[in-house]
């Protein structure tokens, strides 16, 4: 890896961030601010035990505050080659069972810490279907989808630019999981 390649990568990342700043989600139906609140501090071992590693979900709802805390954790910076505030991925989710929240498909707008309802009354089986028809995901209260515009990534960062998206997505998925 030569210094020219590093300079080109840095220019590509800057171009990618400029494009991401100008993108907008035009399918917004309803926007709702998230409501993160401090939660009782737990030890790492307690968090790991409670994180839902079981192959079965209880089909019990989570609260809007719990969902908000998960989403809020996704806004903290990630130390990498690019500014996390100018992410290369978008976060969508299907809310199957969240108290004080309509069932549906949502977009998490990290710029203003809000969620945008994209489609109301999405049935539980849709989240399972989208996860390779695994019923496990129909049972979950919320199912997250981390997406990117792969064509744009490849055009700007080259045919291996997807790796940056995978790296960022892995960190985000880890935060959701815990």
Task: Name each model feature, range by range.
Residues 70, 91, 144, 150, ...:
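Small-aliphatic-rich amphipathic alpha-helix that forms the alpha element of a beta-alpha
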Residues 122-126, 138, 148-149, 174-178:
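Short C-terminal domain-edge/linker segments immediately following a structured domain
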Residues 103-105, 155-158:
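Short conserved micro-motifs at the rims of enzyme active sites and ligand-binding pockets
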Residues 41, 46-47, 145-149, 153-156:
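C-terminal accessory/binding modules appended to enzymatic or scaffolding proteins
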Residues 1-142:
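N-terminal amphipathic, basic helical "cap/leader" segment at the start of enzyme domains
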């Amino acid at each position: 890896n030569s210094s020219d390649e590093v300079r080109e990568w840095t220019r590509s990342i800057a171009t990618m961030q400029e494009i991401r700043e100008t993108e907008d989600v035009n399918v917004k139906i309803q926007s709702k601010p998230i409501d993160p609140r401090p939660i009782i501090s737990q030890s790492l071992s307690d968090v790991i035990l409670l994180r839902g590693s079981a192959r079965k979900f209880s089909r019990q709802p989570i609260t809007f505050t719990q969902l908000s805390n998960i989403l809020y954790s996704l806004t903290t910076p990630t130390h990498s080659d690019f500014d996390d505030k100018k992410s290369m991925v978008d976060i969508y989710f299907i809310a199957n069972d969240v108290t004080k929240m309509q069932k549906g498909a949502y977009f998490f707008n990290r710029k203003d810490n809000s969620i945008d309802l994209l489609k109301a009354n999405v049935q539980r089986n849709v989240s399972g279907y989208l996860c390779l028809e695994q019923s496990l995901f129909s049972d979950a209260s919320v199912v997250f989808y981390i997406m990117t515009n792969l064509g744009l990534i490849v055009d700007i960062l080259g045919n291996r630019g997807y790796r940056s998206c995978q790296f960022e997505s892995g960190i985000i998925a880890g935060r959701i999981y815990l």
